[in-house]
């Protein structure tokens, strides 16, 4: 198969928001200042901010793309998926660890940057941080969560964050995690990027770790 159109879209609607609110998954402590509500890795994070949107990518066989003089933005160099089924909303972290390990193995090298799943939930952020520290020991790549700026667009977010990662490769920068006023203790052992930083990264991992233990990590590299 030469071309695959891949992506997702999500309409932010009260009917879906209310379900996540009933589960206690959404932030409520910053209702008076909603721009500060999505704060992955801050000690005062209290849930995610639901959003909407869409993202579409064209995955194309390299020689096919060259023949039609396509503008090749990046290469999909690694991928892995796991399903741990530990809990509906509280991840174990083990599935995330295996997922990142598998993606790195398929790529064959370490990465310069991770766009984390980082939704701003107390339990989810902690599990992902612990998995990253266990995987990379004392040599963590730069990490940040673009959800701190965009919110969590559910079914669209995996495609969107792959696009954001490609933009960072192309435009030579690392996006920040914003709203970190008091960084959580667990994040102090990783290279957490809190400002837009000029950096000519060559590879980026994008993590999507959903409710129910469905996990995917993909690695895009500069072309």
PLM features per residue range, with description:
Residues 138-151:
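Conserved phosphate-binding/catalytic loops in two-lobed NTP-binding clefts
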Residues 34-113:
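Condensing-enzyme catalytic core mediating Claisen C-C bond formation in acyl metabolism
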Residues 99-107, 131, 135, 161, ...:
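Stable alpha-helical structural segments in soluble proteins, enriched in small hydrophobic residues
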Residues 1-64, 157-223:
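Conserved beta-strand-centric core segments of catalytic alpha/beta enzyme folds
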Residues 11-14, 121-123, 150-151:
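Short, active-site-adjacent cap segments at secondary-structure transitions
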Residues 1, 110-111, 140, 201:
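Local beta-strand N-terminus motif with an aromatic residue
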Residues 85-96, 120-136, 153-160, 193:
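Short glycine/threonine-rich loop-to-helix capping motif typified by GTGT followed
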Residues 117:
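Glycine-centered flexible beta-alpha turn that most often forms the glycine-rich phosphate-binding loop
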């Amino acid at each position: 198969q030469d071309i695959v159109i891949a992506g997702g879209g999500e309409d932010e609607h009260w009917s879906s928001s209310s379900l996540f609110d009933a589960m206690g998954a959404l932030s409520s402590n910053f209702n008076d200042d909603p721009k500060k509500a999505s704060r992955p890795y801050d000690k005062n994070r209290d849930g995610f901010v639901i959003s909407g949107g869409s993202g579409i990518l064209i995955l194309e066989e390299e020689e096919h793309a060259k023949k039609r003089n396509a503008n090749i933005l990046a290469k999909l160099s690694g991928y892995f998926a796991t399903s741990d089924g530990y809990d509906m909303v509280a991840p174990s972290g083990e599935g995330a660890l295996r997922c990142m390990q598998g993606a790195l193995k398929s790529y064959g090298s370490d990465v310069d940057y991770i766009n984390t799943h980082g939704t701003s939930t107390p339990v989810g952020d902690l599990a992902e941080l612990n998995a990253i520290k266990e995987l990379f020991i004392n040599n963590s790549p730069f990490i940040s969560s673009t959800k701190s700026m965009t919110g969590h667009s559910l079914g669209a977010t995996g495609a969107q964050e792959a696009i954001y990662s490609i933009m960072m490769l192309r435009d030579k920068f690392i996006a920040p995690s914003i709203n970190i006023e008091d960084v959580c203790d667990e994040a102090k052992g990783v290279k957490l990027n809190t400002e837009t930083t000029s950096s000519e990264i060559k590879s980026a991992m994008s993590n999507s770790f959903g409710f129910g233990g469905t996990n995917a990590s993909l690695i895009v590299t500069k072309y």
